[in-house]
Design a protein with these regions (language model features):
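Charged alpha-helical initiation segments
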Residues: 1-41, 144-161
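A ubiquitous short alpha-helical element
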Residues: 12-18, 36, 55, 74-80, ...
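Short runs of predominantly hydrophobic/aromatic residues within well-ordered alpha helices
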Residues: 25, 44, 48, 52, ...
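Small residues (Ala/Gly/Ser/Thr
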Residues: 32, 51, 95-97
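Hydrophobic/aromatic-lined pockets within catalytic cores
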Residues: 37-40, 56, 60, 115-118, ...
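Hydrophobic alpha-helical packing segments in soluble, helical-rich domains
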Residues: 42-62, 66-67, 91
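Long, charged low-complexity segments
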Residues: 66-160
Length: 161
């Protein structure tokens, strides 16, 4: 059987959980992935849901209501696409074990959210901090002043004599 290009393509970067993600969440996701790989959907579902709850706790958005916690997490991190939280709510809020494809989707979606929060969010903050330092270091006396542009069609001031 021939191997397709999609079989050899590297996994998207967000699927590899970065070291910036808190260790307790990473450990639970590793367990969820291991269970998924062995088709232990009950264990995998429990682990990913525990990982999500741990994220709520770490992010200080924990509520008894799973959906309310997701809303709070989305409000805390508005740069994360709301659709990701909707998928997590749909798949993660129940008590029953998920089927393999749904479990895979929940794990991948949660990894995407974690990537947005802990990797891209951190990179954005680092970029902004660097740019802020550069701007503060500018010597305003050596920065050319911006001259106002004359508007086309504006009346000119003539001296009266």
């Amino acid at each position: 059987m021939a191997e397709s290009d999609s079989d050899r393509a590297p996994a998207p970067r967000f699927l590899v959980v970065d070291r910036k993600v808190p260790e307790p969440i990473r450990q639970l996701l590793e367990e969820a992935d291991g269970c998924l790989n062995m088709s232990f959907t009950v264990g995998g579902t429990a682990c990913v849901r525990r990982a999500i709850r741990k994220a709520f706790e770490i992010e200080n958005v924990e509520d008894d209501d799973f959906s309310a916690s997701l809303v709070a997490l989305g409000q805390k991190h508005p740069s994360v696409a709301p659709t990701l939280f909707q998928v997590m709510d749909l798949l993660g809020s129940g008590e029953d074990a998920l089927q393999t494809d749904a479990l895979n989707a929940l794990i991948a979606t949660f990894k995407g959210v974690l990537y947005e929060i802990y990797v891209l969010g951190e990179e954005r903050l680092e970029s902004l901090a660097y740019l802020s330092e550069l701007l503060q270091a500018l010597d305003r006396d050596n920065t050319p002043a911006k001259q106002p542009k004359a508007r086309a069609g504006s009346p000119s001031i003539k001296s009266r004599g």
